[in-house]
Design a protein with these regions (language model features):
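Alpha/beta-hydrolase superfamily serine-hydrolase fold, recognizing
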Residues: 1-110
Length: 110
């Protein structure tokens, strides 16, 4: 994650370092799966489709999500576009976002 910090215009790596503290809210017994989706048990989940900017800090979490999918034997696909911002495909106002938003719509229609 930290390696992507200089390329990410929307999420700073420093936030990722401190977010767990906020999520715990002073509690030491918060289950791991509540702190990060990649720490959860994906057993029984259908196909998962990850859409990332290849230049966002959170793209660095992809190996953790891939490992979680493999542990649960869950099929997954990954789409990663360079030079996009976090959640770009949810803002279908430019070409790349429109293309990937259309892919998401097609997936949801199935």
């Amino acid at each position: 994650m930290q390696a992507l910090n200089e390329r990410d215009v929307s999420i700073d790596y420093a936030f990722m370092v401190t977010v767990e503290k906020f999520m715990r809210h002073g509690c030491k017994n918060v289950p791991d799966y509540m702190l990060s989706g990649s720490r959860g048990d994906f057993t029984g989940v259908g196909d998962i489709h990850f859409f990332y900017s290849a230049d966002e800090v959170l793209y660095g979490a992809l190996p953790d999500f891939e490992e979680a999918c493999k542990r649960a034997n869950v099929p997954y696909t990954v789409s990663a576009r360079p030079k996009m911002v976090h959640c770009y495909c949810m803002l279908p106002i430019f070409k790349e976002a429109k293309e990937d938003f259309a892919k998401i719509v097609d997936i949801l229609k199935k």
